[in-house]
A protein has these predicted regions:
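N-terminal pre-Walker A segment at the start of P-loop NTPase domains
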Residues: 1-16, 136-140
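The conserved Walker
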Residues: 31
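Conserved lysine of the Walker
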Residues: 35
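Post-Walker A alpha-helix
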Residues: 38-40
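Post-Walker A helix-loop "phosphate-sensing" segment adjacent to the P-loop in P-loop NTPases
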Residues: 44-55
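Conserved P-loop NTPase "ATPase switch" module shared by AAA+ and STAND
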Residues: 69-94
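Structural recognition of the conserved hydrophobic beta-strand(s) that form the central parallel beta-sheet
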Residues: 83-85, 104-114
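Acidic, divalent-metal-binding catalytic cores of TOPRIM
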Residues: 88-89, 123-320
């Protein structure tokens, strides 16, 4: 499934209205914030249909999956939106992550905890905002510049850059840092970013990670960032997205895709947008001087023109 899908569900007392943009949407929040009410409404409509007290408007069918029989329930659902309420422990398992990778559904998961087995975006973590009879989803982490904390008004001048892995993105920033007599380090996996920052509490660090899959780590890392003035987060969709956004490919189709990625990225084929942008960049540069591989950076990306075009996408970050 791909595209943006609007869901309007409600009774005569309360109505929720929201849009889903990706295959994974996380709803967070404390009790009494309406999360369970939303899932209850979907369940009631699923059981009672149009004759029941809940009305549901959506271009896709909506289902609730729960309990020990979740696998069998999922087997019978295609091209639909699946809601899962908190308390269903199976959402934390690798078994669940594997099972939903091969489906063409969108998933809306209610949880108070991070779900490290799932590569969900920082942009698709929401709380519920209710005003009178109306409820909607409000982004938990939103920054116009993809820079966190949001209160950052001046340009960020780090002494060190930390990337989440040691692939091409790290190799690019390592080379850039060397030019500016700065350090670049890798956390060797997004789940290690938090412990790295705790161990390096006195250093002025800019963390660069793939926003498209950093959702599970965001809560605890952002808490650190908000309590320490020497930390900042920069979360592009991915390093490949940065390259595609830089314009160095001069490709009209890429420009169109970047405008509305939801219209092009099928969740059945790409579990996260990061994977899609990697595949797109690899395909678009194959056989050219910009030939891209994820493991080893092509030196063409370190030429002044390419490098400066990529860095220019990083608003509010100054490395010189």
């Amino acid at each position: 499934m791909k595209g943006i899908h609007k869901v309007v569900v409600g009774t005569k007392y309360l109505k929720y209205e929201f849009e889903l943009r990706r295959n994974l949407t996380i709803i967070r929040g404390d009790s009494a914030t309406g999360k369970t009410t939303l899932v209850d409404m979907i369940r009631t409509h699923m059981n009672d249909g149009e004759s029941g007290p809940v009305t549901l408007n959506c271009d896709k069918s909506c289902y609730v999956v729960e309990g020990n029989l979740w696998k069998g329930q999922l087997d019978n659902i295609q091209d639909s939106i699946v809601f899962i309420d908190e308390g269903n422990e199976f959402v934390k398992t690798k078994d669940f992550a594997r099972a939903i990778q091969q489906t063409d559904n969108y998933y809306v998961i209610v949880t108070r905890e991070g779900l490290p087995a799932l590569p969900y975006s920082v942009e698709e973590v929401y709380g519920i905002r209710t005003s009178g009879k109306y409820g909607t989803l409000k982004r938990s982490y939103h920054s116009f510049y993809r820079i966190y904390p949001d209160s950052t008004t001046e340009n960020i001048k780090p002494e060190k850059i930390l990337t989440e892995d040691s692939n091409s993105g790290y190799q690019f920033f390592d080379a850039v840092c060397a030019e500016h007599q700065m350090q670049c380090d890798t956390a060797n996996g997004k789940s290690n970013v938090f412990s790295y920052l705790k161990a390096h509490r006195n250093e002025k660090i800019l963390v660069i990670a793939d926003g498209a899959a950093f959702g599970p780590e965001m809560d605890r890392v952002l808490q650190l960032v908000q309590t320490r003035e020497n930390l900042a987060l920069y979360l592009p969709e991915s390093f490949e997205w940065l390259i595609l956004s830089s314009g160095i490919l001069k490709d009209m189709e890429v420009a169109q895709i970047l405008q509305t990625p939801s219209d092009y990225i099928d969740g059945k084929d790409y579990f996260s947008w990061e994977r899609y942008f990697t595949a797109l960049l690899t395909e678009k540069t194959a056989g050219t001087y910009l030939n891209y591989t994820k493991k080893t950076l092509n030196e063409a990306y370190l030429s002044d023109g390419a490098k400066n075009a990529i860095l220019s996408q990083m608003a509010k970050v100054r490395l010189s």
